[in-house]
């Protein structure tokens, strides 16, 4: 990876005619440290927002220990730099194979779901594991949003209560 002291130096040397992907590690470290100091909870980075290996490595170096992953490939990306990082498989539609691989090969115990079918799939793919941490995504009203995604993500209110009851029977937390 080429390194430049500034964007101006990059432009002068490369004279790019296409977009250039730049990583400012010091900015990532600074933002991560600031957020971790100010946020009272646990910080979980969504790998899909920037799956670049240098970004993940820099975040781990800054002390981020938890990652929201949406695929086995994202789990591998995190584990390449930290075997102890906690990965939470938060994609709500996963294949049985990816659930099984995540659980049995990588030790992933945290999964998100928003349907009974997804819960059944998780239970079958983990051999009805007793050490799971399951999250139910609930759809909330987005009536004032520019783009209403409330019908795309999460269990609707009328189904969520029953789903919570089912999850409670199978979840560690």
How would you name each of these model-derived features?
Residues 105, 114-173:
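Conserved anion-binding
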């Amino acid at each position: 990876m080429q390194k430049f002291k500034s964007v101006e130096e990059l432009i002068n040397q490369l004279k790019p005619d296409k977009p250039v992907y730049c990583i400012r590690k010091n900015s990532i470290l600074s933002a991560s440290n600031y957020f971790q100091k100010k946020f009272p909870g646990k910080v979980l980075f969504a790998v899909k927002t920037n799956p670049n290996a240098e970004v993940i490595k820099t975040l781990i170096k800054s002390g981020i220990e938890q990652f929201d992953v949406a695929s086995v490939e994202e789990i591998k990306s995190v584990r390449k730099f930290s075997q102890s990082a906690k990965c939470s498989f938060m994609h709500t539609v996963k294949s049985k194979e990816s659930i099984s691989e995540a659980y049995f090969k990588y030790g992933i115990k945290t999964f998100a779901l928003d349907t009974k079918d997804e819960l059944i799939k998780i239970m079958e793919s983990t051999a009805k594991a007793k050490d799971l941490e399951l999250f139910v995504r609930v759809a909330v009203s987005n009536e004032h949003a520019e783009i209403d995604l409330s019908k795309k993500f999460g269990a609707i209110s009328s189904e969520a209560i029953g789903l919570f009851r089912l999850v409670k029977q199978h979840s560690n937390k």
